[in-house]
Amino acid sequence: MAIFGKKGKKGEKEMSFLEHLEELRWHIIRSILAILFFMIVAFIFKSFIFNNIILAPKSPSFFTNRLLCQLGERLNTTALCINTKPLSLINIKMSGQLTTHISVAMVAGLILAFPVILWEFWQFFKPALRSNEAKYAKGAVTAASLLFFIGVLFGFYMLAPLSLHFLSSYEISPEVTNQINIRSYIGTLTSICLATGLVFELPIIAFFLTKIGVITPTFMRKYRKHAIVVIFIIAAIITPPDVFSQTLVAIPLLVLYEVSIFISARVMKQKEKERDDFMNDEDKAKTENATS
């Protein structure tokens, strides 16, 4: 793949380095404009963003909190009832609420514009790809966008309530009272959602790392047990101290790892087929030259 050997839009000649920079600049500008557009939309809908999204996971009436508590009642345990008491938040700066509003709008703009950003960079690299590479990469862009949003939703509906409950209820001494700053709360929430969005990109990362030969399905299978241990350690850290919650968080991550192994195996199989076809074509060409 030769990025700087791309053809121009009309395909009549190769683009110069400066022409590549100009094209990349416009892709970046369009990506920034998409972020700004969604940022403005999020800024305008302040009440909906904060009351129904940002502040929702800390409320006892939040979907996940109610569902886990109902499940706990069926199992005759109170361990699953999380965030039963409303969490009070404070603001300690004069301009704190305004800057918080702006920063939340920026994060929302970045999340909502993620597919546009991927598409713009795909359009930049597309001319440098062969037809079969372009086909795979286009599917990867769609899959990456979908996986990112699924990851963000998983972080919001599953990890965020569990983590907020654990962190807000953890105490080193009864004499210490929590007074949680709104920026600390939002920072925790956005970090969780963005982190899980990126973690859910694992199958896409496995796809490209296998394509360039960095990893193999054999390598991933070899270290499967290590991955399982790491996943359960992470789940134990960010969830309440009960096996059910830890398993609930760990299962999707384990599924992602297995899907990544499957994708890596498919890519390796395709690479081997392409190599065999190339060798057969080489042998055929040598035979034809020898007989001519």
Task: Give names to the regions the model predicted.
Residues 1-292:
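Membrane topogenic/interface segments and analogous intrinsically disordered interaction regions
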